Amino acid sequence: RKMAAAAVNGAAGFSSSGPAATSGAVLQAATGMYEQLKGEWNRKSPNLSKCGEELGRLKLVLLELNFLPTTGTKLTKQQLILARDILEIGAQWSILRKDIPSFERYMAQLKCYYFDYKEQLPESAYMHQLLGLNLLFLLSQNRVAEFHTELERLPAKDIQTNVYIKHPVSLEQYLMEGSYNKVFLAKGNIPAESYAFFIDILLDTIRDEIAGCIEKAYEKILFTEATRILFFNTPKKMTDYAKKRGWVLGPNNYYSFASQQQKPEDTTIPSTELAKQVIEYARQLEMIV
């Protein structure tokens, strides 16, 4: 609390040994700090380290002034909007920093403003984008139950018509159908650039699942066929991925998996058939695309 007070006093021009600042002056100081953060964040290429420092100071101020709606304190509309705006920048900053735990923390706090205070505050321009990002985050982590819990909090109209919400909802449907080609195509139709981060994580997970099926169902696979099945658009990306999985390309341009095959007595017919069905489905995706 002393650190937060010092941050506010410094921004407001008060001495730490002087009289306590009025709530209005403290709010004004916090607003000034937010404007500094906003100015840096809105630059074409924001300094993420500087933004992180500003966010750290502002979080302390929010805690000191009880801006976060977790203390039972009655807050003014201006205070709530200021806190919400700061947290929204924090969530977006976390995506650029590729800091998933930070994004999850910011979203946990933001949901208080989006749901608990929705009748008291004007709707944020970033609300649907961030709620959609949160759905995509849960999907990328395979937290499907939580995905549906969060979805239940949203109006049916948003789920059906809002571009930010529809995107992760469609992705979840494609995954349930096994329509992996549609998931990969969805990357080219993201509603905001920030969605690419979690989609890439989701696509990597899908590739790993397909690659696991390839290893179980085939003794060898042609390089070009593997490239197509795994949805890579360049040979280099296929080569890099193969190295990551320990695949070795033979002189005949085949990847061999003999050493990774299960022993015949340990292989069950259902799992083998399922793997082959997945590969056969993937093989036909080129025609669909």
UniProtKB/Swiss-Prot annotation:
Signal peptide: none annotated. The keyword Disulfide bond does not apply. Residues 101-270 form the PCI domain. It holds the Pfam family CSN8_PSD8_EIF3K. The modification Phosphoserine is found at S45. Gene3D superfamilies: 1.25.40.990. GO terms for biological process: proteasome-mediated ubiquitin-dependent protein catabolic process. The keyword Ubl conjugation applies. Keywords: Isopeptide bond, Phosphoprotein, Proteasome, Ubl conjugation. There is a cross-link at K236 (Glycyl lysine isopeptide (Lys-Gly) (interchain with G-Cter in SUMO2)). InterPro entries: 26S_Psome_Rpn12 (IPR006746), CSN8_PSD8_EIF3K (IPR033464), PCI_dom (IPR000717). GO terms for cellular component: cytosol; nucleus; proteasome accessory complex; proteasome regulatory particle, lid subcomplex. It comes from the Eukaryota. Belongs to the proteasome subunit S14 family. Component of the 19S proteasome regulatory particle complex. The 26S proteasome consists of a 20S core particle (CP) and two 19S regulatory subunits (RP). The regulatory particle is made of a lid composed of 9 subunits including PSMD8, a base containing 6 ATPases and few additional components. Interacts with DDI2. Interacts with TASOR. Component of the 26S proteasome, a multiprotein complex involved in the ATP-dependent degradation of ubiquitinated proteins. This complex plays a key role in the maintenance of protein homeostasis by removing misfolded or damaged proteins, which could impair cellular functions, and by removing proteins whose functions are no longer required. Therefore, the proteasome participates in numerous cellular processes, including cell cycle progression, apoptosis, or DNA damage repair. This is 26S proteasome non-ATPase regulatory subunit 8. It comes from Pongo abelii (Sumatran orangutan). The gene is PSMD8.
